[in-house]
């Protein structure tokens, strides 16, 4: 079961849109998906007219059964929704002594789902920290503008921080550029910079600006149900195909060994960097340097020192 957190500490970057359409697209490919709305704003729940008696708050904080808190959205797609009470839950979580992860404790280890998609709040608080520690990977949607790029760097720094304090390392599988205007030079420059800084293996093809993506939630639909011929549907479908392609390279034992090696100190040109060590044959993401004091620079592999010596020989 792949547990994917959708996270960016900045709001308005297409995080919820990505969570909804990723879940919908995967379910259309015969994958059983549980969508977890962890954002106290409850945008997913509101846009789907969910008024179930029990929700995520009751499951995490009051001992309700998961089945009581789960609503069916469609074939192969369920949701655990939330509302403003999750803000109260966050305060209660913060009072707990020690590093208690409520999601890890409460959600069963083995569930009848292929994917868990977690829509995180756009903040660096307890709910987001719990989600990132619980998830096996994170997708970072980021708008293709200056503020979006700045937030991307800050978000990855946050992930580095939480990996330092946790035995379970969160791996970044994709950076998803959103709100890409093909006519705008700033968008083009930002996208190019993302690919240069984080490598094209990590940065996916962008989600273009498309009015249908804004209209779909008003009609309580995913973009695929609302307008399957729109550019929004086309772009998200490409992204979902990428997620599915990576699925066949998803080796849990390999990922576990990578986690054990992750965040080792690595020195390049006298500068301390933290590196996610990855088998070069695995294209399932994670190929990036995780530390940035000024900016995040490219991808280094373990033999880079040897390569430098060879160049100067």
Residue ranges and their predicted role:
Residues 1-313:
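P-loop NTP-binding core
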């Amino acid at each position: 079961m792949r547990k994917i957190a959708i996270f960016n500490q900045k709001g308005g970057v297409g995080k919820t849109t990505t969570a909804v359409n990723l879940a919908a697209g995967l379910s259309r490919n015969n994958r059983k998906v549980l969508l977890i709305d962890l954002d106290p704003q409850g945008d997913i729940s509101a846009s789907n007219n969910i008024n179930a008696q029990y929700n995520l708050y009751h499951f995490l904080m009051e001992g309700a059964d998961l089945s009581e808190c789960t609503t069916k959205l469609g074939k192969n797609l369920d949701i655990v929704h939330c509302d403003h009470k999750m803000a109260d839950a966050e305060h209660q979580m913060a009072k707990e002594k020690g590093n208690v992860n409520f999601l890890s404790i409460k959600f069963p280890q083995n569930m009848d789902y292929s994917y868990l998609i977690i829509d995180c709040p756009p903040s660096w608080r307890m709910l987001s920290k719990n989600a990132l520690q619980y998830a096996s990977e994170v997708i970072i949607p980021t708008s293709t503008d200056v503020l979006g790029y700045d937030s991307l760097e800050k978000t990855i720094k946050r992930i580095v921080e939480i990996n330092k304090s946790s035995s379970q390392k969160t791996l970044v599988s994709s950076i998803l550029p959103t709100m890409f205007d093909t006519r705008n030079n700033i968008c083009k420059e930002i996208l190019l910079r993302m690919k240069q800084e984080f490598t094209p293996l990590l940065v996916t093809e962008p989600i273009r600006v498309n009015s249908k993506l804004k209209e779909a939630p008003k009609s309580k639909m995913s973009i695929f149900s609302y307008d399957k011929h729109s550019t929004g549907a086309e772009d998200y479908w490409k992204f979902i195909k990428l997620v599915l392609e990576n699925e066949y390279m998803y080796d849990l034992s390999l990922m576990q060994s990578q986690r054990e090696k992750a965040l080792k100190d690595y020195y390049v040109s006298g500068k301390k960097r933290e590196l996610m060590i990855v088998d070069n044959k695995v294209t399932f993401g994670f190929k990036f340097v995780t530390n940035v004091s000024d900016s995040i620079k490219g991808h280094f592999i373990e033999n880079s020192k040897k390569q430098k010596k060879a160049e100067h020989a």
